From Swiss-Prot:
Protein name in the entry: GTP 3',8-cyclase
Residues that, per the record, bind GTP: 18, 67, 100, 160, 262-264
Enzyme Commission identifier(s): 4.1.99.22
Entry keyword GTP-binding: yes
Pathway field: Cofactor biosynthesis; molybdopterin biosynthesis
Keyword Iron set for record: yes
Binding site for [4Fe-4S] cluster 1: 25, 29, 32
Positions annotated to bind [4Fe-4S] cluster 2: 257, 260, 274
Encoding gene per record: moaA
Function per UniProt: Catalyzes the cyclization of GTP to (8S)-3',8-cyclo-7,8-dihydroguanosine 5'-triphosphate.
Catalytic activity: GTP + AH2 + S-adenosyl-L-methionine = (8S)-3',8-cyclo-7,8-dihydroguanosine 5'-triphosphate + 5'-deoxyadenosine + L-methionine + A + H(+)
Annotated positions binding S-adenosyl-L-methionine: 31, 71, 124, 194
Cofactor binding: number and manner: Binds 2 [4Fe-4S] clusters. Binds 1 [4Fe-4S] cluster coordinated with 3 cysteines and an exchangeable S-adenosyl-L-methionine and 1 [4Fe-4S] cluster coordinated with 3 cysteines and the GTP-derived substrate.
Amino acid sequence: MAASELIDTFGRRISYLRLSVTDRCDLRCTYCMPERMQFLPRAEVLTLEELRDLAVGFMRRGITKIRLTGGEPLVRRDVVDLIRALGRHVGDGLEELTLTTNGTQLAGHAQAIADAGVKRINISLDTLDRATFQRLSRRDALASVLGGIAAAKAAGLKIKINTVAMKGVNGHEIPALIEWAHGEGHDVTLIETMPLGEVDEDRTDQFLPLVAVRESLEARWTLTDSDHRTGGPSRYVEVAETGGRLGFITPLTNNFCAGCNRVRVTATGQLYPCLGGGERVDLRAALRSDDPDSNLSTALDTAMKIKPERHDFRIGEGEEPALARHMSMTGG
């Protein structure tokens, strides 16, 4: 074991960084943020150079996969410059550089992203129905998202569709969305609603356990458990009838903490060792200190000591959100 590796107190090796480049987004998805979301002052957000230096510091400590997130990462001005800078490390310590996007800005960036060394991306899409999309995101942007997906496919990017399953919202159209995605050659991952941040709607009413979703899909299709792993929380099945792969992320009904290999850093440089925990370490202060390399490494050691064994997500009538911060702040 290399001395520089990031190992937490439960023996888990941290190899995956989810790095938020902005808390801003051009959608207002009801399960993610309120309509009148108060975004961070720009002065508090790390510069692109600081984000690059931060990522390089993590690579020195054994991080081999970096995912750029938001908010919506592609609304950050000149973010493709950051992608290019990090892409130069792919194959030289960094095994994979990827990002998660809502797809609205993707048509104009897909080729540049692919040229920078990104091989696959995740795209958030909860519905193929224009009215439902507008209700969920509070924006009429489905056509832009579908155009972005088409552009990414044309650029040669491998695409995974992330879909939050919501009772009474999109649960009934999940089979059609899977059929469409698999027909286009895209994997799909279904995600349970997570109790993060104050929003304008009741998550209890929307919560749809994926155990129930899987049972309904098994009545329609032949699902075979897959050995496919991406180092993340998703558990995959192969769908015989569609010829595609389907993942399930179940933080509420079946937590995925034992094999956790990741940390998250916000656009302000706050490291959260756990998506569902309040523990954090300030990396921005280390970056802006007189000895950034040494202080950043020390801060990462501190983060390993406070990473909890598991999250404490709960959802139910009268339950407060597990944490007040929004997913757009943490980096989804």
